[in-house]
Each structure stands twice: as structure tokens, then as C-alpha cells.
A protein has these predicted regions:
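Outer-membrane beta-barrel pore domains
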Residues: 49-51, 70, 93-97, 108, ...
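Interfacial loop-to-helix transition and helix-capping segments at the boundaries
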Residues: 172-178, 238-242
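N-terminal periplasmic/intermembrane-space "pro-region" immediately following the signal or transit peptide
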Residues: 1-42
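A short secondary-structure junction signal
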Residues: 159, 169-174, 196-198, 208
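Disordered, low-complexity tails and leader-like regions
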Residues: 14, 159, 305-307
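Outer membrane beta-barrel
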Residues: 26-167, 177-179, 185-194, 248, ...
Length: 319
């Protein structure tokens, strides 16, 4: 078992143009096209009780720029200066919204798949991501998506796209005859309920891999209750089917004292599991896919302390 302590998982949403707007009296129309700068810094300390070892780590140091060039065209560029010590270009895309509720996105970004894998670091509930979000269903790629939102008492958000399958780096000389795809449907029900279904096809190497994911959550009255299941099948029975499950409960307790440095305290608990998993590209000497992540079960409990700052500032203590 591991004791994980995350200190100052901070997200700063900085509207760099706000001060200059006030000084130059720019029109509201001009203000809409000013770029916005956002950032996330997340440091943590982990201690492994069985081995008696510990470490400090800068898990994320993200900077992103978003904005619009015209009302129907927006953009985003995001880089992580320290993803466990490595620099990674994460998002670089342009989005066109020709009519209300319809959008077309092209570039590099996280594919529309799963619930938990789509959360940015500042949106995560725990110090470490679930197995679905980290090992089994975490995919960023280069491609294009089409999205549409149906309004009404139960809004529905649909997304579908085609992708290279090259990942984030092998783009220049990457040509393929088989295109990967992903599709996701979100149903927003009354009283804070949500149902999300998604599917994805990838081909990391010689074998195609199909993934199917279904999840539900309830977010209301300070509670967030969520459960998600992912099934992964390898073409040609190249590897055993993979099953992964994630469920957790979070409850926000608001601090009534307005002068307090703490805005809320959130106890939370999670159970997640996965069977033996292959990334689809690692082979042994006999040409068979190898296990890259062994089966495991995990129970995580802890507390998140949210500080009363102008931006998101959380201290997450997990065991």
C-alpha cells in the first residue's frame, strides 16, 4: 500500500487581458478576442509504506492559451513543462462553430472517450488518476472530431472523430491505411444524473484494439458519486480481454466562516481495478503481446482541502 500526499495542486485561470482592458476601455466586442492564459502546477509527495521509500515530484506544470480569432473560430495550445519531469505538447487545435451547438475540431487533443480520462489535473478528485484514466483508456492523438449538442430537458452531447493512431510525437513521417476512430455520447438527466457511453478503435501496432466504456454519475447537493467500466478487446485474440472498473464517492463540506483560509473540505473514497493489460505495442521474443500493466485492485481514501483563493487551490491527502 502507498500513502500519497499531494501538496498544492493549484490551477490558475489568468485572464491576462483584463487589466489592459480596463485601462484602454476596449469595447466588449474586442475583449472577446483577447487570449486567455491558464496554468496548472501540481506537486506531490509519496511514501510507500511497504518499501519505506518516499519521493517528491512535480507531476504537472501546464500552461495553455485559449481564445478566438473570429466569433466562430477558437483555438487552444497547451504544453506541460514537467509531466513527471518530461516536456510534452498536449493540445494544439482549432475549433470551428459554424452554427450554434455544432462544432468541428482539428489538431491534437484528447480523444472523446471515457469520463475519468477526460479530466484535467485540476478537475481530478484524487492525487493519482484511476487505472481507466492512466493505464487503460488514456489516449491523446492527432485527428478531427465533429460534435453536436441537443438541447432540452435532457441535453445530449455527441462527439465522434477520426485519428492517425500515431500518438503525440510520430506525426511528420506517419502514414497509415487504417484510421482510428472514437465516439462518445453524454446524456444529462434531471437532478444531476449523467450517463456516458463511448467506444474507440486504436491500432498501436499489428493488431487493432476495440474499447467500450460506460459510466454514470450523480452530482448534486455536495455529492459526487460515480462508476465507470471499460472493456478492451485485442484483434486476432492477440491478448486476453481487459476489464477495468472505477467507482468513487466525494462529499463537499462547505466552511461557513467567510474569513477562513479553507473554502471546503471533501472526504472521498475510491475503488478501482484492472486485469492484466497490454499497451498493444510491446512484444516478446516469440512475437506475442506482453503484459505492460499487471492486474491489480486498489482502495483509496482521503480528504481534499480546498483553499479560499481566487483560483483553484487544493491539498489532497490520500492513502
Amino acid at each position: 500500500m502507498k500513502t500519497k500526499f499531494t501538496l498544492a495542486a493549484i490551477t490558475m485561470a489568468i485572464f491576462s487581458s483584463s487589466e489592459s482592458m480596463a485601462q484602454t476601455n476596449q469595447s466588449e466586442k474586442e475583449q472577446k478576442f483577447m487570449p486567455e492564459i491558464h496554468g496548472t502546477i501540481r506537486g506531490k509527495y509519496e511514501y510507500q509504506t511497504e518499501e519505506g521509500e518516499g519521493r517528491f515530484e512535480v507531476r504537472n506544470a501546464r500552461i495553455s492559451i485559449t481564445g478566438k480569432v473570429v466569433p466562430m473560430v477558437s483555438y487552444k495550445a497547451e504544453i506541460d513543462l514537467s509531466d513527471e519531469g518530461k516536456i510534452k505538447m498536449l493540445d494544439a487545435y482549432t475549433r470551428v462553430t459554424p452554427v450554434d451547438r455544432l462544432n468541428f475540431t482539428i489538431g491534437q487533443f484528447r480523444v472523446p472517450f471515457t469520463i475519468d480520462a477526460h479530466r484535467s489535473p485540476h478537475q481530478q478528485y484524487f492525487a493519482n488518476r484511476s487505472f481507466i484514466a492512466k493505464q487503460v483508456g488514456n489516449v491523446r492523438d492527432v485527428g478531427a472530431t465533429l460534435g453536436y449538442k441537443f438541447q432540452g430537458e435532457c441535453p445530449v452531447v455527441l462527439e465522434a472523430g477520426l485519428f492517425n493512431g500515431s500518438g503525440l510525437t510520430d506525426q511528420k513521417d506517419y502514414w497509415t491505411k487504417s484510421v482510428n476512430f472514437s465516439a462518445k455520447a453524454q446524456l444529462f438527466l434531471p437532478k444531476g444524473f449523467n450517463v456516458t457511453l463511448s467506444t474507440q478503435k486504436i491500432k498501436p501496432s499489428d493488431h487493432a484494439v476495440m474499447m467500450y466504456d460506460g459510466g454514470v454519475y450523480w452530482h448534486a447537493k455536495g455529492w459526487h458519486v460515480e462508476a465507470e467500466y471499460l472493456f478492451k478487446h485485442y484483434g486476432g485474440n492477440a491478448f486476453n480481454d481487459v476489464h477495468s472498473f472505477d467507482s468513487f464517492i466525494n462529499y463537499d463540506i462547505a466552511v461557513k466562516n467567510k474569513k477562513s483560509m479553507v473554502k471546503k473540505v471533501s472526504p472521498l473514497i475510491r475503488y478501482d481495478m484492472m486485469t492484466d493489460h497490454s499497451d498493444g505495442s510491446s512484444y516478446d521474443d516469440n512475437g506475442k503481446l506482453t503484459i505492460t500493466d499487471y492486474k491489480r485492485h486498489r482502495l483509496t481514501g482521503g480528504m481534499t482541502i480546498s483553499l479560499a483563493t481566487p483560483f483553484v487551490s487544493d491539498i489532497r491527502i490520500n492513502y
